[in-house]
Amino acid sequence: MKKNALWLLCILVLPAIACGRKPEKKVTISSSGRKEDDLVTGLPGQPPVNFKHYAGYVNLGPEQKQKALFYWFFEAQQNSSRRPLVLWLNGGPGCSSIAYGAAQELGPFLVHDNGGKLTYNHFSWNKEANMLFLEAPVGVGFSYTNNSMDLQKLGDEVTASDSLAFLINWFMKFPEFRSSEFYISGESYAGHYVPQLAEVIYDRNKKVTKDSSINLKGFMIGNAVINEATDMAGLVDYAWSHAIISDEVHTSIHGSCSFEEDTTNKTEQCYNNFKGFMDAYNDIDIYSIYTPVCLSSLLSSSPRKPKIVVSPRLLTFDDLWDKFPAGYDPCTESYAENYFNRKDVQVALHANVTNLPYPYSPCSGVIKRWSDAPSTMIPIIQKLLTGGLRIWIYSGDTDGRVPVTSTRYSIKKMGLKVESPWRSWFHKSQVAGWVETYAGGLNFVTVRGAGHQVPALAPAQSLTLFSHFISSVPLPSKRF
């Protein structure tokens, strides 16, 4: 089967499968309980900075000593004790928040030069908050288990429960942040991860003492997988409205594929008609439709094909090509992969202490199954809105994979009353996007000219968006 046909089969039919190498041996967890042992002091290529950062493992509990999740934590650049704590999650499922979020989007050190250099990110989100990046679930990045059966039980529910266990134990390492305002943010399939983790924290907080609770205030998700039916309809309509697919392809898909709830789209006619959709994206980047694709080598003009991570249901594969703002290079996914496979880097980050039997990969090659993935996050979002959490949903408007149309359709399905009508918002002298506020405080924000990974293509605008979110301040309505 040709690669594009496999991709199409995956998004329409198959359950979660991520092709890659299978672990050949068990590993033993070694995880310090002292944060001082996780302090990073000699990261290769790191520019000088005036803040501390930590990396290492956290065991998931006395009954789960075989499982440990890997983290990288950056203190805020100023007044860290008075700044909020923000957990960032990437999607997939199976993609690393460190290889993508930290190293290619919003962390303070961005990987360049084929993994040989780190550059300082002037728009890092740790300018505004203490930033915690987590590789979850086990099997992602450096996170691991010594029980191979754990890899057969992965899904949304396990990811949420393991992430909660991680946080509880992480706060034991970093008790000074236990009372900090806590937010969760992420993109793509983190449209599942983030609300689900927020819900288990919210529910747990009702059962424990204040001293044991997590001071959850809200979450922000970008280009997020939210609701299967509307996400899929928006995917097709976006391609048509942006002149990527023809009228004929658009009409044939709508005529043969159902975009109603609880449908599977497994018909042969739907599959065949979707081939035209796939063909249209063969030579452009679906995650950022107006930027160049990565070429496989300097000697070849053939586009470098993205790694395809097949995820549950229709909308959840996510290869997450990165897009850096200055000196744009669409090949930096491989740069991050090369960097984190370096032994000196792993030693500096206290990573891979058990010598995993497979190389580091930005998207996991060992997760073969994904057991559960609800078709919609809308009930959870509505529950947490009612519970008083601050929720912002943003969308880079040049992403074709989880496009702005999908997000608009999903929010419309929530049936919320508009409180502040659609308006432009500004970054300095330019329109940065548009914003609309709904009952309960839900903000929907677009980011003009940004693709799937908003912090990478619109770094200054994303930092403005982030700072206003955590401050609960309306986005600028005038030039400044």
From Swiss-Prot:
Tissue specificity statement from the Swiss-Prot or TrEMBL entry: Expressed in seedlings, flowers and siliques.
Entry's Gene Ontology molecular function annotations: serine-type carboxypeptidase activity
EC supergroup of this enzyme: hydrolase
GO cellular component, one term: extracellular region
Disulfide bond positions: 95-363, 257-270, 294-331
Position of the signal peptide: 1-20
The entry's keywords: Carboxypeptidase, Disulfide bond, Glycoprotein, Hydrolase, Protease, Secreted, Signal
Family named by the database record: Belongs to the peptidase S10 family.
PANTHER family: SERINE CARBOXYPEPTIDASE-LIKE 35, SERINE PROTEASE FAMILY S10 SERINE CARBOXYPEPTIDASE
Name this protein carries in UniProt: Serine carboxypeptidase-like 35
